[in-house]
């Protein structure tokens, strides 16, 4: 069973979803992940970086989707992204544009990784989120540009 959030619930959830990627305090980041994600929630990076694709192809493997599942794995994923992009103070993740609702308690949102120095966009992505009965993210399919 899925939960279709109200507009207020959706705004709060998306704000916390973005906040987890920018949160400098490890325990607060872990708490945000538990609030945002269902216990068995998963994120699938649909279009992994070229290096991952090339390595898989070299072994004769099909194009791999990269997936993390559960709070502990998600904490590692979010923490690594924070360390790589945000911790230095160079970038911040922000929602860009409007959230688009889809039938069946799913939404799509666009985010950007913005330079704190000059405001330019250094990266972006599209997330398609589906929710569990408690209104937490059950699945996230991420497309990174």
Language model features with spans:
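C-terminal and inter-domain tail/linker signature
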Residues: 1-145
């Amino acid at each position: 069973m899925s939960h279709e959030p109200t507009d207020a619930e959706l705004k709060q959830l998306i704000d916390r979803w973005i906040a987890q990627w920018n949160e400098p305090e490890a325990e607060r980041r872990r708490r945000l992940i538990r609030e945002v994600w269902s216990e068995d929630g998963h994120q699938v990076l649909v279009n992994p970086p070229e290096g991952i694709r090339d390595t898989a192809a070299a072994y004769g493997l099909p194009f791999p989707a990269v997936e993390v599942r559960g709070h502990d794995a998600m904490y590692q994923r979010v923490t690594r992204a924070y360390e790589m992009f945000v911790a230095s103070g160079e970038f911040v993740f922000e929602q860009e544009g409007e959230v688009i609702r889809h039938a069946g308690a799913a939404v799509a949102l666009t985010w950007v990784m913005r330079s704190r120095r000059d405001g330019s966009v250094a990266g972006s992505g599209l997330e398609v989120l589906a929710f569990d009965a408690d209104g937490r993210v059950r699945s996230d399919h991420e497309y990174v540009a």
